[in-house]
Amino acid sequence: MKKIIAMAVVAAVAVSMVCAQITVGAKGTFGMNLGSKVSDEAKVLFSGNDDAKNAFMVNGGGSIYGRYNLPFLPALGVQLEFGLTANNGAGLKVEYEGVEMTATASYLSLDFPLLVTYDIPVGSIMITPMVGINFSVPVGSPKFVFKTDENEAAMDMGDLKDTGFIPGIVAGVEVGIPVGPGSITAGLSYVNDFTPVKLKSDGFDEKVDLLTRRNFNISLGYALKF
């Protein structure tokens, strides 16, 4: 009897796996730092003033993803993404020897969001709220730019090798419009990292907390369901 029950459970799971709805897609993103915080240590390092005001920056990137919906809960899904985001960062409005300038720090990251999604059909349009965790990994060296109305200069001030994985949360909503064999997707999302990227600056023995990323993103892509 136990064997029969076990076989029935395995068969039910197998059927569910086979019949599950799978979505794959790709999207490009464009956004800005909205709430990204430069640490007081970094403000002093770049401007000599921990009261320097933050400045806006824009970022861009793209990702591929897969979403898995079970037949007995067709609206509920789990989505795994792999993304690349360029120009994460923040800026400071500073004054140096009477000259006003903007100092920006930016970096490239690999992002791995794991999301719970919920599909809400509205006519032929699909609205999908989503929320989940994100793990980010800084890649390469950060870029530092000092810009005035007349000049712009880039500087190498260290690396982010000691940062490691950065945990965070991401939430948003996506709208899918059927076009051809799949759907054009447009979305809004907000990424909030929990810990800062750490700068190992030349000439300093200790690591410096550089900034904590908080990005608002707009996306446009295409998805196929199987």
Functional labels for PLM-detected ranges:
Residues M1-T23, F226:
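Cleavable N-terminal export/targeting peptides
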Residues C19-N69, A223-F226:
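Short glycine/proline- and aromatic-enriched beta-strand/turn motifs that initiate or cap beta-hairpins
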Residues A20-V24, P74-L80, G123-P129, G180-I184, ...:
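Outer-envelope beta-barrel architecture signal
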Residues G28-M32, S36, I64-K147, L224-F226:
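Gram-negative (and chloroplast) outer-membrane scaffold detector with strong preference
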Residues L34-M57, A86-S109, S136-I166, V170, ...:
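Extracellular/periplasm-exposed beta-strand and loop segments of Gram-negative cell-envelope proteins
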Residues N59-Y65, D111-L115, V170-G172, N217-S219:
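Membrane-embedded beta-strand positions in outer-membrane beta-barrel channels/transporters
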Residues P167-V179:
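Conserved C-terminal beta-signal and adjacent last beta-strands/turns
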Residues T185-D193, A223-K225:
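A hydrophobic membrane-anchoring alpha-helix module
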